[in-house]
Amino acid sequence: MQILVVGAGITGCSLAHLMKHKGHNVLIKEKQDHIGGLCYTTISPSGILYEPYGGHAFHTKDNRVKELVLKFSDFNNYRHNKGIVINSKLRHFPLSRETIRNMEDSEQILKELKERPKIPDLTNFETYSISKFGLTLYKLFIYNYSKKMWGLEPKELTTEYIRNRIELKNTNTHIFEDKFQGLPIKGYTELLRNMIHDIPLELNTIKFDESLFDLILFSGRIDELLKFEFGNLPFRSLLFEYQENENWENENYGTINLPQHPKYIRKVNFKIMHQQKINNTLIQYQEPIPAKNNKPPLYPIYTKENIELFNKYLIEACKSDKIIPIGRLGLYKYLEMGQAISLAMDMIPLIEEWKNLNYIDRYSEIKNLLSN
């Protein structure tokens, strides 16, 4: 088949490579002047590798994903350690009973944890969080962070983003427990460049003639694909600010969450994450903002209304015999990098059968894949 991939982010590049090596003719179009999408890596004037859309620690339990990325880059041995500032004190994150015992409200927090229901309350983001962590911890490290992050009261959100994302441990641990973790030695852009080295690539354009292709894998916004027929699907974005050679509280942490800061939600130390032996530092501060006025859409906002609107768009998109939505923006799904590649791999049978299915079966199969 003649296949066009629109978007050279991690999903687009992965599917382009996989479809090419299944014998299909593939072309990639990318609207930016570079590949990489949201995991694009570049280098600062002082020589520090960094990701302009936020620091990313790669991790996966999927051996298929591990084997694929290791074909195109060596990885450093960074394991994602994160700190969190609560009441002006730096603590380990995710919070553990070990950390809680040293907190001012430890007695009340431990009492609330003991009284938690056995089954979390899935009514909304807030009820789930309180039923998992108790009211005191919720107010300390979840409520303000989440309100800043999403621009909404947590009770307006569904549980999809937070469910199973944060777990309370007995002792301090890494954020991710996957055996395979790290960052590509030369960054994500180089990894993806190697992945698609044998595939034609056109930058600065995503215009295409549908008649020239058998299938088009579209990793842009699904609402944009359908010309915003049902209205705008809301996303959150981030505004990034940088400080060089600023003091960093603890060299064990690549990122530090700032739930009580009036503006920022977190800060990233790229030298630590990329494990560069260099004198300079580059700290990135992240401020959540609406994805408007050409700000990049980064995070789907999980409210009941938004999910219903996405489902409406997805049903309509599935009526096309040629164009298939993929990736975080096309499927309105928060995907970490390992998850994005894993989902891309899982979508291949659907992609190859797309023309033989009716739109209801296409829709059902995508929803099934997204629920895994």
Predicted segments, located by residue:
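Conserved flavin/dinucleotide-binding core of flavoenzymes
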Residues: L95, V268-N372
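Dinucleotide-binding Rossmann-like beta1-alpha1 core, especially the glycine-rich loop
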Residues: S46-K118
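Active-site/ligand-binding neighborhood in enzyme catalytic cores
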Residues: N87-L215, S219, D223-L226
